[in-house]
Every structure is written in structure tokens, then in C-alpha cells.
């Protein structure tokens, strides 16, 4: 199961006593600020959590798995996430259920 924006808003509502509307708006503003920073080429650093970076990938050869045809994969910019030390430490010893 994945954590959703709606669940984040619900946590703000329950733990901080915000109205549901304000909690939803807060979550939206938070993610919009991250999007804006990345769109303008900035790194996003969230202390104790991790960093979002932009990385330029060069064009490279690829292959269509159905046809076997060689197809170039175009150059593009991607968002990467590097977890911080505190986040790594917290998830390091969690048992994974299958």
C-alpha cells in the first residue's frame, strides 16, 4: 500500500487539528513548491529526509523488447531522490513482508 496525499492531509487534520480543507491545501502547497523548485532547476533539500535533484541523461541505444528493433532513447532530464542518513537509518532494519 502507498501513502497518498489524502492520507497526509488526514494526518494533518488528526494530529495538528487543522480543518480538512486547510490540511488538503497545505499538502497541495507543499508539493507545488517542490514542483516549482525543480521546474526552475533548483535542488530540493529536506533536512532529515533527503534531496531531490535534476539529472541530465544522454541519448543512448535501446531496444524494443517486442520486436528486437534498435531504437535510440532520447536525451532527457530526470528527477532523482537521494535519501538522507536519518531516513536510511530508520528504514534500514525494517522487515519486508511479501
UniProtKB/Swiss-Prot annotation:
One of its GO terms (biological process) is regulation of translation. Residues 51-71 are annotated as: Disordered. The keyword Protein transport does not apply. Residues 53-69 have a biased composition (Basic and acidic residues). It comes from the Bacteria. CDD domains: IHF_A. GO terms for cellular component: cytosol. One of its GO terms (molecular function) is DNA binding. Keywords: DNA recombination, DNA-binding, Transcription, Transcription regulation, Translation regulation. The keyword DNA-binding applies. Belongs to the bacterial histone-like protein family. Heterodimer of an alpha and a beta chain. This is Integration host factor subunit alpha.
Amino acid at each position: 500500500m502507498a501513502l497518498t496525499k489524502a492520507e497526509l492531509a488526514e494526518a494533518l487534520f488528526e494530529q495538528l487539528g487543522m480543518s480538512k480543507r486547510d490540511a488538503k491545501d497545505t499538502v497541495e502547497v507543499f508539493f507545488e513548491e517542490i514542483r516549482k523548485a525543480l521546474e526552475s532547476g533548483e535542488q530540493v533539500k529536506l533536512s532529515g529526509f533527503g534531496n531531490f535533484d535534476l539529472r541530465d541523461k544522454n541519448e543512448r541505444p535501446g531496444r524494443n523488447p517486442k520486436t528486437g528493433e534498435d531504437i535510440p532513447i532520447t536525451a532527457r532530464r530526470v528527477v532523482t531522490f537521494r535519501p538522507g542518513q536519518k531516513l536510511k537509518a530508520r528504514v534500514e532494519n525494517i522487515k519486508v513482508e511479501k
